[in-house]
Regions:
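C-terminal motif of bacterial Sec signal peptides marking the signal peptidase cleavage site
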Residues: 25-27
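N-terminal secretory signal peptides that target proteins for export/translocation
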Residues: 1-10
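Sec-dependent signal peptide recognition
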Residues: 13-18
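N-terminal mature-domain "stem" immediately C-terminal to a signal peptide or N-terminal signal-anchor/transmembrane
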Residues: 29-99
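Acidic/His-rich structured neighborhood in mature extracellular/periplasmic domains
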Residues: 97-255, 326, 330-333
Length: 333
């Protein structure tokens, strides 16, 4: 956005306050469509590596793992080293750990593997949502390579990973926010997004994060907010049927809290003069995930800085209808 180019502390303060004031007056709810509906559809390839990996038999682990390497030569090394953390050349240790991964009940691996296969037996809805999202993204950025999606079971090690033209999803991390074995591996606030319905949002969010770099000379909170806000705004255009709270990873109650107290949130940010701070502790509090946003109040959800940034960008776009998505994403904050 032209207003947010680096033009000095005093000027950016005045402009920043002005834009935030516009946000407070105008609210949110951009329904303007920036991507036409009648575009050529594409289909993203989804590889069911999970079915193959769980087809390994405890009494023939060595042979079955070799077959996985033969059948999935591009992904198997990524899975073994990147997800399981086992050197590919250490086949004896890999076989030992893999047998435990298949049969262990104390850590819940065996139960979780079965639950994952049952819950993700049908992925038609996921396929449809991802097809729509990547179709719309491909219309905007036709030169971007559409990734191949691999589903796998990670032993609670990974939710979404990205490597070159591969996106991987650990489906065992999306078994529902009340899945009992999550109590052993994550904090309560993280469970909100550990649902099957969150997979498509997480995949597209990861893809955007890797393909749209953050560039800022000063790395102030306001610039971080705007950058995250632009990503969320673009995501809302890729998945227009998704509720706003799902896009940011909030519950409906958390979203409603933010809307109810948005003026108080803004007043708190202004009182603390946080907009132009660069301290990592301040940026982390507002931007990174957590049980709450400590710089505001313990009653708040985490990542309030992302929510505020989205509101700012949404307000900007509703008041500047001639600005295209390309122009928005290419602006320096």
């Amino acid at each position: 956005m032209e207003q947010f180019k680096q033009i000095g502390n005093k000027a950016i303060r005045q402009i920043g306050y002005g834009l935030l004031a516009i946000w407070m007056l105008c609210g949110c709810g951009n329904k303007y469509q920036y991507i036409p509906k009648d575009i050529e559809p594409i289909s993203i390839d989804i590889v069911r590596f999970d079915n193959a990996q769980l087809g390994v038999r405890p009494d023939s682990v060595k042979q079955d793992i070799k077959k996985l390497y033969d059948d999935y030569e591009s992904f198997m090394p990524i899975f073994v080293e990147g997800i399981l953390g086992i050197p590919t050349e250490d086949t004896a240790y890999l076989c030992e750990m893999y047998a435990q991964f298949l049969t262990d009940t104390a850590m819940g691996f065996a139960q979780t593997n079965a639950k994952a296969q049952s819950l993700f037996a049908n992925i038609d809805s996921l396929q449809e949502t991802l097809n729509m999202g990547f179709t719309r993204l491909h219309h905007l950025y036709p030169d971007w390579k559409i990734p191949t999606l691999y589903l796998f079971v990670s032993g609670f090690n990974s939710s979404v990973m990205y490597y070159e033209d591969i996106v991987g999803v650990g489906i065992d991390m999306y078994l529902g926010s009340k899945y009992p074995y999550y109590n052993q591996v994550v904090y309560d606030y993280q469970k909100q997004t550990m649902r099957k319905a969150c997979v498509a949002v997480d995949v597209l969010s990861m893809y955007l994060a890797y393909n749209i770099p953050y560039n800022s000379k000063y790395n102030r909170l306001l610039e971080q907010m705007i950058f995250r806000g632009k990503q969320l705004f673009l995501l809302s255009q890729l998945l227009p049927d998704e509720p706003e709270w799902e896009l940011i990873g909030y519950s409906k109650e958390q979203w409603d809290w933010c809307e109810k107290y948005e003026k108080a949130i803004w007043n708190r940010i202004m009182e603390k003069r946080d907009l132009f701070k660069t301290e990592s502790s301040v940026l982390s509090s507002y931007i990174n995930d957590g049980p709450f946003t400590s710089e505001v109040t313990q009653d708040s959800p985490g990542r309030l800085g992302q929510w505020v940034g989205w509101r700012i960008v949404d307000s900007y776009m509703r008041n500047n209808k001639k600005v295209t998505l390309h122009e928005l994403m290419n602006e320096n904050d």
